[in-house]
């Protein structure tokens, strides 16, 4: 009797092993995450840590994680000052700030809590600054203060201004490195990462247990019960592959930085930002210290002629035409034509950017800077030319597997990196609720 019981147990284990082996051979998963940026990787990590029995994979088109936006940014840990109270951005940024610092300490990831000054240099900016301070209080930004000219000098000896917001918990970190740590956690928990897997199509399979097939441009396939897409610069295109609306549309904007010469880096201790002008969609040029001791200046914001175009010479005519023929882009361009021309001029002429920087640190001269790296921001637009300024989630239309079993993260702009652990928790909640994952 005991022998038969043992035999049945061994047989069950054997059959379970065969099924697991077959799944691995066919690359069958409970959840596949499309996109190995910081949001996709953090989300894959979170769902697997919650449900270690699930088979989860990340597919990423590049040869490494965090290759685009997650690895090409200023490296700032934001505190949640700018965002509309009650928005997901405001909530998730403040939550993500605390989660990030806790995670960095647990993993011994290097970071610096250098703080940030948002500096007003005239009376009009002082009025805007006061409104921004009220917003930061509404958002529960930790320990934020309104400081005078004397205190500005105490914090940043070479900076001038009438008044400023001081955020002591704003910091800097290498977000590409952080994404690698998320990926390491994910792999150690049993997750699979498929690199060089550029998604070409989604199809319904004939297997009811794994109803979705994801095919790459190299004709590789994975099957899955459920799909989460976090496509970043390609998020609208990925969503369209499943029959989703093309909106919001992604239009790429390149942000070009200058580098401060090493012998002048002592002029900057922490992040120094201008007061944002509500008439324009971007924050303006600022001073950002880096983990390696360098200081980045900028960025500007110019239309990229390619979705992943980090230089003026990076041009894809199909992608460029796709952007400029979009009605929302045309309306936005007309709305911001003056600002757009200024940004292009600043891109071509370094002295114009330096002039902006001298409002805060007069000691910076044209010969103290040189051209530096660039990043590309996935800016989501609606049909009316409005910049979509919060996180957007979507799923397909209809009653098929591609509609019912897929969740798209359509827009995760700055402060997406700071918010990544908080976004991951929210996405995991959505996956559990939408797909009844226990």
Region spans (language model):
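Beta1/beta-strand and adjacent pyrophosphate-binding region of the FAD-binding site
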Residues: 25-39, 57
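Flavin-dependent oxidoreductases
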Residues: 42, 202-316
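Dinucleotide-binding Rossmann-like beta1-alpha1 core, especially the glycine-rich loop
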Residues: 75-151, 155, 161, 284-285, ...
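Short beta-strand to alpha-helix junction loop
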Residues: 84-95, 119-128, 166-185, 194, ...
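Helical element adjacent to the flavin cofactor pocket in flavoenzyme catalytic cores
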Residues: 165-226, 230-237, 421-432
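Active-site lid/adjacent beta-loop-alpha segment flanking the redox-cofactor pocket in flavoenzymes
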Residues: 266-373
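C-terminal catalytic lobe of FAD-dependent flavoproteins
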Residues: 327, 332-438
């Amino acid at each position: 009797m005991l022998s038969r019981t043992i035999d049945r147990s061994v047989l069950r284990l054997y059959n379970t092993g065969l099924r697991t082996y077959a799944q691995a051979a066919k690359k069958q998963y409970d959840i596949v995450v499309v996109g190995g940026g910081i949001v996709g990787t953090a989300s894959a990590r979170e769902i697997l840590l919650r449900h270690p029995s699930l088979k989860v994979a990340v597919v990423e088109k590049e040869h490494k994680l965090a290759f685009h936006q997650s690895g090409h940014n200023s490296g700032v840990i934001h505190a949640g000052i700018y965002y509309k109270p009650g928005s997901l951005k405001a909530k998730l940024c403040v939550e993500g700030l605390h989660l990030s610092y806790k995670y960095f300490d647990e993993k011994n990831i290097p970071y610096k809590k250098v703080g940030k000054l948002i500096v007003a240099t005239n009376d009009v900016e002082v009025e805007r600054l006061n409104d921004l301070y009220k917003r930061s209080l509404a958002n529960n930004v930790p320990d934020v203060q309104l400081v005078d000219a004397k205190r500005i000098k105490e914090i940043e000896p070479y900076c001038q201004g009438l008044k400023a917001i001081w955020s002591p918990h704003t910091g800097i970190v290498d977000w590409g490195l952080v994404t690698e740590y998320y990926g390491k956690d994910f792999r150690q928990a049993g997750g699979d990462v498929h690199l060089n897997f550029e998604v070409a199509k989604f199809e319904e399979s004939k297997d009811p247990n794994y109803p979705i097939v994801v095919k790459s441009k190299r004709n590789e396939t994975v099957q899955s019960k459920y799909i989460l897409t976090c496509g970043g610069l390609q998020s609208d295109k990925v969503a369209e592959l499943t029959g989703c609306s093309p909106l919001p549309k992604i239009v790429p904007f390149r942000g070009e930085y200058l580098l401060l010469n090493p012998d002048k880096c002592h002029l900057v201790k922490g992040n120094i930002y201008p007061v944002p002008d509500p008439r324009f969609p971007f924050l303006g040029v600022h001073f950002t210290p880096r983990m390696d001791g360098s200081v980045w200046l900028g960025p500007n914001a110019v239309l990229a002629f390619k979705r992943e175009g980090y230089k003026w010479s990076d041009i894809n005519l199909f992608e460029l035409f796709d952007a400029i023929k979009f009605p929302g882009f045309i309306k936005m361009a007309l709305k911001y034509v003056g600002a757009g021309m200024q940004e292009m001029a600043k891109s071509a002429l370094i002295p114009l950017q330096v002039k902006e920087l001298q409002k805060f640190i007069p000691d910076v001269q044209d010969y103290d800077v040189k051209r530096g790296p660039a990043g590309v921001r996935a800016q989501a637009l609606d049909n009316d030319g409005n910049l979509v300024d919060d996180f957007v989630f979507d799923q397909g239309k209809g009653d098929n597997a591609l509609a019912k079993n897929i969740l798209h993260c359509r827009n995760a702009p700055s402060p997406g990196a700071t918010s990544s652990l908080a976004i991951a928790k929210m996405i995991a909640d959505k996956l559990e609720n939408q797909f009844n994952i226990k």
